[in-house]
């Protein structure tokens, strides 16, 4: 299984990450507040320049993270789906097309939510339906991520069953699930059980250690809130074909040498989970 790492703050380190042993990068598009920049004419060339630096280092784009509106902020506009779509849909359509231009076919997304389960689902069904033609045109899979809302609360997108509602509704090769292990833990969900429930619908991972009520983005095995060996074994059991993608953050203020040591440790941990088991 390929091992990948999110690209936040690592732009100069791509050759070093390849040397450590990483196979790919989880490419994060800019934050929601940069809408004008994303929709500008020169945005594509800027993104593709970064992609070329990654490719020149011998790394692939394992998956992307589409621009999202953070769940802890006040809702966009009046909080209705119409306001969310008006702001986000043009961004998402452009980024899906760019994903394919980076030779990647997997895009994680944070869906819309509000207090009402029915209205949340109604809005998201509209959103995905409007994204489907572009997803199909470019051969990109939309991987719906489990997320939380204000105060780490439930937003009808926290469980495997929440994600499978959309996968089962569309029954499309272009709609799957992204399991964020840290988000699962903070919502007191078991990532091992989530993998088993998602099965073949699981297309992407955001792997990181966490504890309930936080979003720490530490390497796997650093916090014992998950049986990581069982987690990896569950991935194999369901036939997961994506990358073991770690969405981790080095402590702020580290030197480049220390940052690389952090990523070397993380890669070694991931690799150790994949070692053949000794026969008893």
Region roles according to the model:
Residues 1, 63-78:
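N-terminal small/glycine-rich loop or linker at the start of catalytic domains
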Residues 33-37, 72-77, 115-118, 150-153, ...:
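A short acidic, helix-capping loop that chelates divalent metal ions and anchors anionic groups
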């Amino acid at each position: 299984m390929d091992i990948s790492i999110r690209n936040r703050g690592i732009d100069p380190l791509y050759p070093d990450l390849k040397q450590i042993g990483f196979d790919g990068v989880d490419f994060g598009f800019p934050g929601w507040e940069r809408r004008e920049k994303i929709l500008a004419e020169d945005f594509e060339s800027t993104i593709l320049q970064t992609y070329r630096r990654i490719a020149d280092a011998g790394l692939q784009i394992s998956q992307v993270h589409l621009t999202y509106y953070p769940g802890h902020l006040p809702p966009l506009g009046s909080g209705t789906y119409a306001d969310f779509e008006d702001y986000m849909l043009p961004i998402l359509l452009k980024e899906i097309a760019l994903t394919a231009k980076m030779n990647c076919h997997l895009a994680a997304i944070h869906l819309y939510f509000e207090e009402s389960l029915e209205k949340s689902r109604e809005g998201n069904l509209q959103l995905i339906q409007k994204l489907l033609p572009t997803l199909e045109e470019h051969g990109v899979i939309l991987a719906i991520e489990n997320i939380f809302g204000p105060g780490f609360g439930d937003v009808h997108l926290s469980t495997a069953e929440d994600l499978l509602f959309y996968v089962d509704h569309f029954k499309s090769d272009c709609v799957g699930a992204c399991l964020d292990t840290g988000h699962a833990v903070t919502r007191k969900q078991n990532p091992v059980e989530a993998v088993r429930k998602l099965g073949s619908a699981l297309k992407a991972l955001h792997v990181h250690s966490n504890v309930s009520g936080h979003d720490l983005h530490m390497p796997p095995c650093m916090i014992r809130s998950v049986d990581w060996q069982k987690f990896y074994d569950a991935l194999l059991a369901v036939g997961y074909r994506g990358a073991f993608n770690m969405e981790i953050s080095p402590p702020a203020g580290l030197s480049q040498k220390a940052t690389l040591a952090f990523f070397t440790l993380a890669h070694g941990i991931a690799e150790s989970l994949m070692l053949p088991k000794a026969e008893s």
